[in-house]
């Protein structure tokens, strides 16, 4: 073992690691999964004698994460950060860590075809589904998806790997597994089902029918702020525990998981670790996506433009704090259907979480992949307001902030490094238009983001144009101050 994590000054696994059975294959061993689903499984094993263990898999990228985990007996550290206290736990629920580039595709597929595998879960980010954010449909013409359809036995996408594993289980007479998305998308289970069945129909119609008959795709809502791991993060974890852990991750103390209780081959008793098992996740998903993620994106674009590197920096500016609070309660909350939740209290708790100085959640990180995030975080709410003839000035400002950000130059004239799967389309829209009103019209014409309806809505285009021109003329700080409400 490269690092003796079992000697760390942390909460250590008290369960026998050998008694865990690998029942879940997880695709996407990133920071969020380690700090969220991994912790729930660790709590169940520690406090409730659960024997549900994980096979962790990375398909594209993240080779070093898997290699680091393999070097330390599949153990890793999760540090919870509040303003004045850091605590750490060593998570031991991983039975094996695999990467296609290290271990080979056949090894990954063989793991997914072990008879006891009951669930395949995913955290691959929105862009990993290769679906259109505006329509939710699988992009069969995307080069990676098209390549998998042509060569389905050697897939590279997560969808292709899942369908090939299910095809092999069907051929071997093995039962299907549940496929559970844990990514930030509304009705992520429906998105997962639609991309899997669309892909399967393109490959094998009989297999597609078997999947529809035998596989479930529960929706989930996941919540925990997990900043990207930095060298500073790892140094603090080492200072806290006395052990260097390159697979370590740090997060806030808060965590939430709402799960649609729809599994074909059993599941862990996640409720014993604090998860909520419900029949309909959508109201919770919409609450989180619009109030938390929507305000996060708002702060990310407008904060970055103002020179704020971290979300907690934004919270120290009272105008940004008031604007985020107003966005949550005045423009997002009215669109929600969730019952039995005090939304004002929820908003207050979000502001407190954003203000945590230990997190240092970078605005640039949250600003990534905006084309995949705007529809569910802001644009669905805009459509609600247009239908109800109500104000959406802050939502319009958030959209304008994204447009100003993807223009690629900040208010000091410095280049912005844009990370987005639609970057070529966005850059074409920017480069083919003059700055100002024409830029807004050019970006609104991207149908994969704004659909057919919003670009043709004169009220929406007017509001976005008005706020965009204000950002150009007065800058982000002054514009946010103008629209914030105390």
Curated annotation (Swiss-Prot):
Binding site residues for NAD(+): 24-35
GO BP annotations, alphabetical order: mannitol metabolic process
Enzyme class, first EC level, given as a word: oxidoreductase
PROSITE patterns (alphabetical): MANNITOL_DHGENASE
Listed GO MF terms: oxidoreductase activity, acting on the CH-OH group of donors, NAD or NADP as acceptor
Source superkingdom: Bacteria
Annotated keywords: NAD, Oxidoreductase
EC number: 1.-.-.-
Family designation: Belongs to the mannitol dehydrogenase family. UxuB subfamily.
Descriptive protein name: Uncharacterized oxidoreductase YdfI
Organism this protein belongs to: Escherichia coli (strain K12)
